[in-house]
Structure formats: structure tokens, C-alpha cells
Amino acid sequence: GDAQDSATVDVLRQFLTEMRPMLEAIDSTSGQGDVLRRETEALLDGLKRHQALFPEDPVPDVVWMPSGFNFALYPTPTCLAVGLDWFMGPTQPLLEELPPSQFPQYRLNRMKPEWMASDAMKGWLLVTHQHRIPPGARTADLMLFWGQIMHLTSLYMPNATPAQLLNWTSEEWAWAEANERAIWAQVQPQERMFNDNPREVMRWFQEGPFTRVGDIPQESPDKLGAYLGWKMVQAHTAARGDLPVDGWFMAQDPQPFLRTYRP
């Protein structure tokens, strides 16, 4: 409304009153000067590495902002907005007021300030390359896509641990490493590897407390399809040491990657 209208002023005052606790929480956590400097430097370094490998791609402007818990990341080809309220730390008291149906404990546990840059880098790559996912994508297709994204993110964010890049704890990463062959045995059957039922395929890649597929136990971490895809891409690039980045990152046929992966 009109800036001179008293009703408009009242609405703005109400908005500021409602936002104040969130802004104060951000200022003491993810929005602290040293935290933002550290995460900005890491993210910009990652984007510079991307530009060196893919000079034709536009580099997005990075915007740190409160989102009102509407989004953690809002990536476009030219802008990468990061919701600071999603990275205030899992022990921030304000998070206790969020509805558990939308913010379950596993999601709260991942709201770490030190994950802002790596989450933003990975999220930007996922969104800007999602057009490469083929229609009727099979489990194998999404394993390749996620593996490519994870491997490229790891090159751009060399100081991030593998567990961090998957939004896992170190214990969850250790579990996956110890059970890699058993996980592979669950996805290897043709009816799972080349399944194109979206609901069944996404069980391997969606966020959750664990991976809800077959005989995989509840102590497993989520997104085990992304984990196996990453392992698959790592195995392929190791076997093809002369392969340039665009040679494996832009590939869309999972078969050569499946052939070189032997857990």
C-alpha cells in the first residue's frame, strides 16, 4: 500500500516484530561476521573452480538472506540465495517452535552453519543441471546424475568431508562405507536398477531418516542412491585417468559407469 498510509505502517511494524526473534537468532549464529566471511570465501572459491572448468556457464550472484523458513536455497542460473535461518545450528531454541511435521529432527540436525557453502554449491549444481535428467528416469539414471553432482561438488569444496557433502554424520558415513557391498546388492537386481517407477526410484535419493528400500535397515542414512552413484563415478574416473571433467560430468549413459564399479 501507500507508504503514507497508516495501515501500511502498521503492517510493516507487525512484520518487523514477528521477524525480530529470527533476525536476532541469525545474527548470533549463521549471520555472524566471521561465519559469513568463512562460508562466502568457500562458496566463491567453489564457483571460481566451476568457472575455470566451465567458462561458458554464468557465475551466480550470492545472496545471504532470512527466508522466514520458506527455503534453504533458492538457486537460479544467475542468482544463488541462501536462507540463513536454515543454518542457525540444531540447538538454536527458535527451532523448537517449528512444526515437527515440516521440520523433523533429522532435518533440524542438518541446519549447521558450517554446511552453508557446501549445501549451496551442491544445490546450485543440482538445480542448474536438473534438465539433464531424462524423462522416465530409472534408478541407474539418477544414480549417475547424483554421482556426477556429488563428485563435482567434492572437487569444488575440497575442505568438506564426504559425510558433510551428503548431509550425514561421520557415523552415517562409516556405516555406508562398511555396508557398501550390501547396499549394492540391494540395488543391483535389474528390476531395481532399471526401475522407472518414480515413487520407487526416489526412495533411493530422497531426504529422510534412512533409506526405505528392500532389506536396508533403519540404521542406514538416507540417499544411499546418491552415495552409490558417487562411488560409481569415482570408480569410472579412476579407471579412466585421462578423462576430462566434461567427459564424465556431461555423460548420460550409466552403463560405462556401472561396468567399472566393483564394490
Where are these regions (language model features)?
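N-terminal, post-signal-peptide region of Sec/Tat-exported proteins
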Residues: 1-7
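Acidic/His-rich structured neighborhood in mature extracellular/periplasmic domains
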Residues: 9-173
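A cross-kingdom marker for long, charged
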Residues: 140-263
